């Protein structure tokens, strides 16, 4: 990825501590070699959610649900997230992670293409 180092440093400076369940899911995903968003992407998403305050979000590619949970935690209460996953092995893991994070009502997972 080509990103100016100053921008990456700035985005990392915005990073605040995540909620414990996100840290746990991140560690599990990394241990299982499941791709999740990078730290600077997390920081950027948090800033964009604060600025835009969306009421609907569509995510293509759920994986284990890490980014959907992140967006759910940092978006307005009335925001609803729809995420789509077609890899059958990850769907139950994502659903379990949504439950762990208390996000079952805020996040809808659609299975398939």
Report residues per predicted region.
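A short alpha-helical cap/connector motif
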Residues: 1-113
């Amino acid at each position: 990825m080509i990103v100016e180092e100053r921008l990456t440093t700035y985005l990392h400076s915005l990073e605040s501590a995540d909620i414990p369940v996100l840290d746990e899911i991140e560690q599990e995903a990394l241990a299982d070699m499941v791709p999740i968003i990078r730290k600077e992407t997390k920081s950027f998403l948090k800033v964009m959610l604060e600025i835009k305050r969306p009421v609907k979000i569509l995510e293509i590619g759920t994986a284990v649900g890490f980014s959907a949970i992140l967006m759910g935690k940092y978006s307005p209460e009335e925001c609803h997230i729809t995420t789509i996953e077609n890899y059958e092995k990850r769907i139950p893991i994502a659903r379990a992670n949504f439950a762990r994070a208390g996000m079952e009502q805020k996040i809808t997972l659609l299975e398939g293409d």
